[in-house]
């Protein structure tokens, strides 16, 4: 596959790609920017010219506009309900499984560009002894104090480091518990920050988990971890993989409900059986996968 950049007067950077396996010109519009700063890519069969891709783009302008508008609306809704992080400003807040993070703008007396993080419990001590996590009831409060001159990339970098610190603690603990409980052996866990996937498992048994997992409700966070652990026994997404993952997901939800998790209660129907009012339920692992896909990474 080879690629070329095209500067469109309306849409900005468009990535043109030639692919030997493509049989027709196709267009993809993503909700997040790619590494070139654009959101649109055009794939062209190897036998055609890049100009053929540009010509097809011209014909599909109205469709692209609609797609961009739909994604903009979707992104705005995602910010409102916490599934995405928009522009960071004074008062911006987001919840993780561990903490409520609030950004506070304060001028600095020294004139130096510095960011401070304050941490304090957000619940009564007796409430912090619960065994389950919830983004609706984080245990800690973290204030990120920043000056007016702070840039968006700078503030996002600070946020990423806060999430990384929480992910290293929580995800390492969770994967260790799951591995022991369900009989998995992995070599190494690495916490990653990327926008392409929530997790991955290598043939060597190394597991990567995205630091954004701490922003998901606990059943969804656990689903991703169990998904990657399942690949240690079932490398592909065949029937065996889905049977194993479904069993693990149901057992985990059952355990969360037993210890009082309010986020797990919505999946109680899958613990009681495979049907509701005579209708067969969609496999739980598929439901959890769809819900994870509605979240946006920082």
Predicted regions and their residues:
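Active-site-proximal or metal-binding-adjacent scaffold patches in catalytic folds
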Residues: 1-223, 232-298
């Amino acid at each position: 596959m080879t690629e070329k950049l095209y500067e469109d007067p309306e849409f900005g950077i468009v990535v043109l790609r030639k692919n030997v396996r493509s049989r027709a010109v196709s267009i993809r519009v993503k909700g997040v920017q790619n590494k070139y700063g654009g959101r649109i890519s055009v794939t062209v069969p190897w036998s055609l010219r890049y100009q053929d891709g540009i010509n097809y783009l011209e014909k599909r302008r109205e469709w692209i506009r609609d797609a961009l508008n739909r994604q903009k609306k979707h992104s705005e809704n995602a910010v409102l309900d916490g599934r995405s992080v928009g522009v960071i400003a004074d008062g911006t807040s987001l919840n993780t499984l561990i903490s409520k993070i609030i950004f506070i703008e304060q001028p600095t007396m020294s004139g130096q560009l510095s960011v401070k993080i304050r941490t304090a419990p957000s619940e009564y001590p007796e409430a912090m002894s619960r065994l389950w996590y919830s983004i609706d009831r984080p245990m800690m409060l973290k204030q990120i104090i920043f000056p007016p001159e702070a840039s968006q990339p700078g503030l996002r970098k600070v946020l990423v480091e806060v999430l990384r610190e929480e992910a290293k603690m929580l995800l390492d603990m969770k994967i260790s518990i799951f591995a022991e409980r369900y009989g998995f052996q992995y070599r190494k866990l690495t916490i990653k920050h990327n926008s392409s996937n929530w997790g991955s498992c290598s043939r060597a048994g190394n597991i990567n988990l995205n630091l954004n997992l701490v922003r998901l409700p606990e059943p969804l966070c656990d689903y991703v971890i169990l998904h990657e652990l399942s690949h240690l026994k079932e490398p592909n997404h065949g029937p065996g993989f889905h049977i194993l993952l479904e069993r693990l997901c149901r057992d985990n939800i059952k355990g969360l409900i037993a210890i009082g998790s309010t986020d797990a209660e919505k999946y109680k129907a899958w613990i009681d059986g495979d049907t509701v009012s005579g209708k067969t339920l969609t496999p739980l692992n598929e439901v959890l996968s769809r819900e994870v896909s509605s979240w946006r990474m920082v």
